[in-house]
Amino acid sequence: MDYAPQSLYSKPNYYWPLMDNAFRKVAFEKGVHVRLMMSRWNHTWTEFYSHLYSLQDFNSSLTRGSIEVRLFQVPDYNISVPYSRVNHNKYMVTDNTAFITTSNWSADYYTDTAGISFVIQGENSAEQSQIVNDVSGVFLRDWNSQYSKSIYDFDIHGNPKN
């Protein structure tokens, strides 16, 4: 999944902080622990790293809550299938809700394309449905895997720090 608080394909590009502001606001005002895991692959735009660094760096102003950013990278494999070897998951999961979408997280995907998204909750909004539990399990599996690295393992241009 790609993330940018801007349009990517519109001309001229424009700033679109809807999600960016929401992540910062819930961490700052409600003490929520936000974890973002984005894909890192051959087609990752260099500009994405500065946006993700900005979210991670916001932690220094938080007295409670947090924002943690990780990059998930599927290992290279000697195969020439275009747009493969990437984690294409696009979802958000909370304690009791899952939001699943076909859209990358940038303005154009929500304002100019015909993607689809849906929200899943338990019958009682305080309960976690089995699907939400499963989506949360997939997230935690990937988050804790060897393929998930802190944004700080990469420089501002996306080059690995060694």
Indicate where each model-derived feature is located.
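PLD/PLD-like phosphodiesterase catalytic module centered on the HKD motif
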Residues: 3-162
